[in-house]
């Protein structure tokens, strides 16, 4: 029988975050929707520019009602982004505080079961550091970094979809350019790291 290796790093953080699974999932979904909504103003600007170019140089032929509707669309996108991101942060903070509470209660109940000599040997400063600082780091990840990580993964996908839907040739050229830039950067930093 092989012992299962305890999880560390990001895997352990996700395991702790999943103790409040419904709130974490709600935060991830809302953060993804906020990332999508953040692109709505750019889409509205694209449609406005397209409409202006369609009638240029006779700008009097512009339909002001459609321009105003695109303006409202942009404003709605900004508002939706703010509301959805706020809701995502609310869910992630509720999950983080619930997880912190459980971690502290479990840690302190475990401390109550260990021999008194352990407390003397370790010292109160180290125990306080664990309860205050180390457990608080979990809150930073669940409450703040998790929604931002999700948005950081969703945003490039949404941007790629928008680029490809506007003009697949220019979108593909843009995506290939970004990929080449990442390859060059990794090669350059790889050599720099090898020198050290």
Task: Enumerate the language-model features and the residues they cover.
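Membrane-interfacial segments
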Residues: 49-57, 95-96, 100, 115, ...
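Helix-boundary and loop/linker segments of multi-pass membrane transporters
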Residues: 13-20, 60-67, 133-134, 148-149
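Transmembrane helix-loop-helix hairpins at lipid-water interfaces of multipass membrane proteins
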Residues: 24-84, 164-169
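Membrane-proximal cytosolic tails and large cytosolic loops of membrane proteins
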Residues: 1-7, 47, 58
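A short amphipathic helical element positioned immediately N-terminal to and/or at the very start
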Residues: 5-24, 126-127, 131
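Juxtamembrane helix-loop junctions of ABC transporter transmembrane domains
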Residues: 6, 37-45, 77-124, 128, ...
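Transmembrane helices of ABC transporter permease
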Residues: 19, 23-34, 147-196
């Amino acid at each position: 029988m092989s012992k299962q290796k305890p999880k560390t790093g990001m895997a352990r953080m996700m395991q702790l975050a999943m103790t409040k699974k419904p709130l974490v999932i709600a935060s991830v979904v809302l953060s993804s929707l906020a990332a999508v909504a953040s692109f709505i103003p750019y889409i509205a600007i694209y449609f406005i520019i397209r409409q202006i170019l369609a009638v240029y140089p006779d700008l009097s032929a512009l339909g002001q009602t459609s321009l105003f509707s695109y303006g409202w669309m942009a404003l709605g996108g900004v508002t939706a982004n703010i509301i959805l991101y706020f809701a995502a942060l609310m869910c992630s903070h509720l999950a983080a505080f619930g997880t912190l509470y459980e971690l502290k209660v479990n840690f302190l109940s475990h401390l109550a079961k260990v021999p008194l000599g352990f407390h003397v040997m370790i010292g109160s400063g180290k125990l306080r550091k664990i309860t205050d600082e180390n457990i608080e780091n979990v809150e930073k990840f669940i409450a703040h970094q998790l929604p931002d990580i999700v948005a950081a993964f969703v945003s490039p996908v949404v941007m790629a979809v928008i680029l490809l839907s506007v003009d697949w040739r220019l979108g593909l050229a843009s995506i290939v350019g970004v990929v080449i830039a990442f390859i060059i950067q990794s090669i350059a930093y790889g050599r720099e790291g090898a020198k050290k």
